[in-house]
Regions:
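An alpha-helical repeat/solenoid feature that recognizes helix-turn-helix modules
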Residues: 1-129, 154
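Basic polycationic patches enriched in arginine
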Residues: 133, 138, 143-147
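N-terminal charge/polar-biased segments
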Residues: 141, 154-155
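Short, intrinsically disordered C-terminal tails of secreted or membrane-associated proteins
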Residues: 150-151
């Protein structure tokens, strides 16, 4: 969002945000945070990796402008490694907030939509958006896109 309105993405405060995200990356390459972080602020940015939270972190770091960061490679590897054979991702943890400390929401499509969006964003970012043609994008994520279509038709 900031880059789209002409903000300089190399500003110190933006780099600090990126660095914080990178400091929260788990050893498996993903990112996660549990709902307990609302009760215990020391848990912010900490928790088991989830596909949706990994995707959010990846898109944030990609927006900072350097496609060759180790954190990005590790996050992309996490998403590829944890994708199920049918193209879906499993997400056992709640990642949606209803009212913090009162109730939480499980948005079942978060685990499908956001990893696909993050992988497509990374691909366009790393290879250059001009090289992203519809046929190439379809070949990159065929299982996931089929799974999204199947899930939508089941709803």
């Amino acid at each position: 969002g900031l880059a789209s309105i002409g903000e300089n993405m190399d500003q110190e405060w933006i780099r600090r945000g990126r660095d914080w995200l990178e400091s929260c990356q788990n050893d498996d390459g993903g990112w996660g945070e549990t709902c307990e972080s609302y009760n215990f602020p020391a848990l912010k940015g900490r928790g088991p990796s989830t596909p949706s939270q990994t995707a959010w972190a990846l898109m944030g770091i990609c927006a900072c402008g350097d496609p060759h960061r180790e954190s990005i490679r590790r996050g992309v590897d996490y998403l590829i490694r944890t994708q199920n054979p049918d193209g879906s991702w499993t997400e056992d943890y709640t990642t949606g907030t209803g009212f913090p400390c009162v109730f939480y929401l499980k948005y079942d499509m978060y685990r499908q939509h956001f990893p696909l969006l993050a992988l497509a964003t990374y691909r366009g970012f790393a290879l250059g958006w001009a090289s992203c043609r519809a046929g190439t994008a379809r070949s990159l994520l065929p299982r996931g896109l089929r799974r999204l279509g199947a899930a939508a038709s089941e709803a």
